[in-house]
């Protein structure tokens, strides 16, 4: 059962403000990102500190943005995309804890937790890099502050924190950001249909963020004995669970979750789901030892060298490496594993092909098993480079783009 929140050392916001004022000038503050943003704490910090650095992964919604606030991240979310004071550190998700330990010393960790059960609160939807930061802040003698929220689901694994290990808590009753699942469009369904046949019963799945990975999950209703080992999941996992598609002897493992309120209600107190820290979920060695590891990630562009851009638009940083590179490497080494890059063949708003001769900006990932669009599956891994080009043009590219792509391939001396 639940203990009352009176087992937490609560502090009045005014007293916390006094404590924050005594911090060293321009402190570095880490807060949960994704859908676990601690809005109340961030507002309080922003009112007290004239100048600080705010580090969040995939920041969503409204976060403090003004002169004096530097935004810092290894994965840019919509909350930071237009920030004039953005410091972007290119880094795979599995290595982000290393950067925060070695290069970016943290003064304050903000947490957004559940109410306590048996003297433990839970980080709920967002574990990710937070345990690593927790340890680093402890070692430096920094501050750990939590906002304790009855609406945050109580999840298990590395999400749990003993109440005595938190310096200060404030009590909030704050709605969590939620996202209702939307039905996949025709293009996403077509792509999912091509990947479906490559996913056997008993496979372990990692799916990235976006409509296409969601559609792939939606296509797997006939599979059995599936497992989840992923940095994140959303409502598609709940739908498959309800249809009996998972091996229930093995926990569904992820590092962060976002989705609907219905998903959050299912997560609360659910021991079938195990939240693990980034260094565990995204460890390429661990991923490679998982048989039939299937990784499905999206991209903005793929070029004729099989390189993917999933992080920049017109050279400007849009997201980051994230964990896709960790899983692509791991899945390629997995016995029976596959790493798919899945994307529509045509960018509807820009009216251009997503299969391009050469990516203009930095590469997010390379060496994938296959590139999949609504037109087909291009087998990349194991093919000679000219056959890779042929596969990409004939199987993945939009028919209207193929002639120009063949011309480009000839100019590259690869056709």
Regions found by a protein language model. Name each.
Residues 4-415:
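Conserved alpha/beta enzyme-core scaffold
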